[in-house]
A protein has these predicted regions:
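Conserved H-D interstitial segment of serine endopeptidase catalytic domains
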Residues: 36-79, 135, 149, 156-158
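Extracellular/periplasmic catalytic domains that process cell-envelope and extracellular macromolecules
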Residues: 7-11, 30, 80-82, 109-114, ...
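Conserved beta-strand elements of beta-rich interaction domains across eukaryotes
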Residues: 23, 35-36, 42-43, 54-56, ...
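Extracellular trypsin-like serine protease catalytic domains
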Residues: 1, 15, 19-21, 115-235
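Conserved hydrophobic/aromatic beta-strand scaffold that supports enzyme active sites
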Residues: 15, 35-37, 63, 86-88, ...
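Protease-domain processing segments flanking chymotrypsin-fold serine proteases, especially trypsin-like
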Residues: 1-37, 48-53, 59, 139
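Extracytoplasmic
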Residues: 11-13, 44-46, 63-68, 84-86, ...
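Serine endopeptidase catalytic core focused on the charge-relay Asp
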Residues: 79-101, 110-122
Length: 235
């Protein structure tokens, strides 16, 4: 997470950490007691789910560990184009809902340009001093604590200028004018929440993220409501 700061602990109670054989792999979002939503590119064979996390290295109290009963990436996911980068995970046993572990609402409408959002994750953060961003002095590292950044929805027209021909209608871009706040490597699969509603899933962007002024690109959740609801019903 670039240009963000440590989140108020448990202020994003739907935030999920996905682990692969004990290593942090991706973010995700709790959307019901049984279901977690993430990006298809986060799929690995031995996914474990951690809920109620803030500091990944410390036991805090509200953490819950879950195994995954079913991993369901979108059937038409394409790694090269990032198309349909969405995946559902069914938990083996339901989350115990609490103040620190709570599902996020799915959207009833699509995000509007300029809408204010929060992106959260345990992805790379920059250690640089102000003014060194993009210089060889710029350093990135993985934080222990969940980070949050305030960004807004970028109009499709300007996002298309940054990524000609690569942004589909089922994607949404978000960032800040001129760059400086963005999701980064390791934030993948995590939530973009606008007005308390899950509007995006961290999908892709310009690499390396600490030297770019281009916005991040997110899977647009409103495009997948049918698929999400159908899949949850059938499984």
């Amino acid at each position: 997470m670039l240009g963000g700061e440590e989140c108020e602990p448990h202020s994003q109670p739907w935030q999920v950490a996905l682990f692969e054989r004990g290593r942090f792999n991706c973010g995700a979002s709790l959307i019901s007691a049984h279901w977690v939503l993430s990006a298809a590119h986060c799929q690995t064979r031995f996914l474990r789910v951690r809920l109620g996390e803030h500091n990944l290295r410390k036991r805090d109290g509200p953490e819950q560990l879950r195994t995954v009963a079913r991993i369901i990436p979108h059937p038409r996911y394409e790694a090269r184009s990032h198309r349909h980068d969405v995946m559902l995970l069914r938990l083996t046993r339901p989350a115990r809902l609490s103040r620190q572990v709570r599902p996020v609402a799915l959207p009833t409408r699509c995000p509007q340009p300029g809408e204010a959002c929060v992106v959260s994750g345990w992805g790379l953060v920059s250690d640089d001093k102000p003014g060194t961003k993009g210089s060889p002095k710029s350093q990135v590292s993985l934080p222990d604590t969940l980070h949050c950044a305030n960004i807004s929805v970028i109009p499709a027209t300007s996002c298309n200028e940054d990524y000609p021909g690569r942004v589909m209608a089922s994607m949404v871009c978000a960032g800040v004018e001129g760059g400086g706040a963005d999701s980064c490597e390791g934030d993948s699969g995590g939530p973009l929440v606008c007005g308390g509603v899950l509007q995006g899933i961290v999908s892709w962007g310009d690499v390396p993220c600490d030297t770019t002024t281009k916005p991040g690109v997110y899977t647009k959740v409103c495009s997948y409501l049918e698929w999400i609801k159908e899949t949850m019903k059938r499984n």
